[in-house]
Amino acid sequence: MGLAVLLTACQSKQQHTLVVKLHENWTVSSAHDKQSYPASVPGNIYSDLMDNEIIEDPFVGENEHKVQWVSDSVWVYKSTFTLPNTVLDKQHITLNFDGLDTYATVLLNGEALLNTNNAFRNYTVQVKDLLTAENAIEIQFEPTSTYENKAKAELDVTMPEGNRIFTRKAQFQYGWDWGPVLNTSGIWKDIYIKAWDVAAIDHIYLEENGYTVEEASFNVNVALTNPAVVGNSIEVEVAGKRFIIEVN
């Protein structure tokens, strides 16, 4: 079964959401060394350092022990991007981060935009007033130990499993019986600009009502960026059949 959902505007046929992925022109450098290297987004610092032959493959031999300095360093990712007027003229523009690992400070055109502390969640920031045709973004990642040691010092008891429990990120990066200690950082999911007028679809989820061998019944729940908007409709296509739901 295929499902497609489209938001349309009755008063205008120009109600389209534009998405611009920011995956190009990235570099990475240590905060203590201004030498920069090409970086991949999505990706992580260990992969970028390997690609630039700064470190050896940590999964080979005992190389794991030679690269522990990576997780103790501050890493800065930078990029520039251009936006056309078709994006800049939209009423609403957000900068979206689907995954930053983990303690990051984000600057857009020199302005502090966001601080993150959770690699599992996404972040969305309104940025229309900060954007121009030519833009620069910078993301600085701090070592997790900076925050973990502080959190540990504030407790009167010793917690099991060491520092890992204080940080919301993939726990296997701290080492496991099947894998090395590679506490990485970086932009591990998509970064993108989202621009729209009036309203846009925020997220969609299905709610099952019941099913038999012959058929199933479920609700399609659609959350909008502006749920109070009227004069629009939700078009849902399921298995080739279209349904129109008016927003009122």
Task: Provide a role label for each language-model segment.
Residues 1-2:
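Sec-dependent signal peptide recognition
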Residues 25-53, 184:
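Predominantly extracellular/luminal regions of secreted and cell-surface proteins
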Residues 106-108, 215-248:
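Beta-strand-rich binding/interaction modules
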Residues 195-228:
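Surface beta-strand/loop "capping" patches
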Residues 7-9:
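C-terminal motif of bacterial Sec signal peptides marking the signal peptidase cleavage site
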Residues 57-68:
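Surface-exposed, low-complexity/disordered Ser/Thr/Gly/Pro/Asn-rich loops and linkers
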Residues 14-32, 72-200, 226-228, 241-243:
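Accessory beta-strand-rich segments of carbohydrate-active enzymes
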Residues 67-72, 209-213:
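Short, solvent-exposed beta-strand/turn "edge" segments of beta-rich domains on protein surfaces
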